[in-house]
């Protein structure tokens, strides 16, 4: 059975209870497949990145196969919210709904979009209809609005993001479709030989947090950021921020030491 989120952000949890860990979030307009049903909860698989988890059943709207097929075609080429947050207004009842960056807007044209037959208005200056060209200038212009968004485990919206939620949303604005977790994102694309080859938009992965705790495990990716150039990275650790990057890792000026150990670099041009 298929379904869709008509809420701004819906938590996807590790277990079927409100107090369970949040693994990820489902944004407005994202679809899912139901894998298992309980009286109050559905175990689902997200269509965009394959993440699985439990969602409160009342926070999802069912879709017929016909609706899903038609919507999926429109979703693939949909416009996208490019700013951290914007309000859309339903033309049916004039109620507003906050939408966050990365939210796709189907059937969009000139500040209006439609989802399952419901028309909405939105500020056109906060919407992109084509992916942004990935270069240093455009990357800096885009991410400056996301600075200081706080860290939230499982988050991928303007009120809280984790490291891989941040990279997934930002890179989607540049037409790159990433998996959800840092360890998964590290498995796609072509690796750079070393940091001297880094270009703006490359994904930078780290395998250890806190270099004083012993040797890093090269098999365990724990963190990801986006390179601005070979000396700077923007990432979410505590908050979204720009920090110094070198062949050792991320140097935290506030702490006076390295916070993350460099593991690998993925060429953004090799990502789809």
What are these regions (language model features)?
Residues 196-213:
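Hydrophobic/aromatic-rich core segments of domains that either
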Residues 1-7, 17, 24, 30-31, ...:
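Boundary regions of SH3-family modules and the immediately adjacent low-complexity/disordered segments
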Residues 61-62, 128-129, 192, 218-223, ...:
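Aromatic- and glycine-rich peptidoglycan recognition patches
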Residues 36, 109, 207-208, 237:
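Conserved "cap/hinge" positions at secondary-structure junctions
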Residues 33, 103-106, 205, 226, ...:
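Hydrophobic beta-strand signal
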Residues 22, 95, 191-194:
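Short, conserved secondary-structure segments in the cores of folded domains
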Residues 151-200:
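Catalytic cysteine-centered active-site loop
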């Amino acid at each position: 059975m298929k379904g869709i989120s008509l809420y701004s952000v819906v938590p996807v949890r590790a277990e079927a209870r409100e107090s369970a860990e949040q693994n990820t979030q489902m944004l407005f307009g994202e679809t899912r497949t139901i894998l298992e049903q309980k009286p109050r909860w559905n175990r689902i698989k997200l269509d965009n990145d394959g993440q699985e988890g439990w969602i409160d059943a009342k926070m999802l709207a069912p879709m017929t196969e016909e609706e899903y097929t038609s919507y999926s075609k429109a979703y693939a080429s949909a416009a996208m919210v490019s700013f951290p947050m914007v309000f859309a207004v339903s033309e049916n009842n004039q109620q507003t709904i906050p939408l966050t960056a990365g939210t796709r807007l189907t059937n969009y044209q000139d500040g209006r979009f439609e989802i399952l037959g419901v028309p909405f208005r939105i500020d056109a200056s906060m919407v992109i209809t084509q992916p942004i060209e990935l270069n240093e200038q455009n990357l800096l212009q885009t991410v400056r609005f996301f600075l200081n968004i706080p860290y939230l485990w499982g988050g991928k919206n303007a009120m809280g993001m984790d490291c891989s939620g941040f990279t997934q949303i930002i890179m989607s604005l540049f037409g790159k479709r990433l998996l959800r977790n840092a360890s998964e994102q590290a498995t796609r694309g072509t690796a750079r030989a070393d940091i001297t080859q880094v270009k703006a938009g490359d994904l930078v992965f780290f395998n250890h947090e806190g270099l004083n705790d012993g040797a890093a495990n090269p098999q365990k990716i724990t963190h990801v950021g986006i390179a601005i150039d070979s000396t700077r990275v923007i990432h979410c650790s505590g908050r979204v921020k720009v920090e110094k990057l070198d062949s050792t890792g991320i140097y935290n000026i506030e702490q006076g030491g390295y916070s993350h150990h460099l593991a690998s670099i993925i060429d953004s041009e090799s990502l789809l």
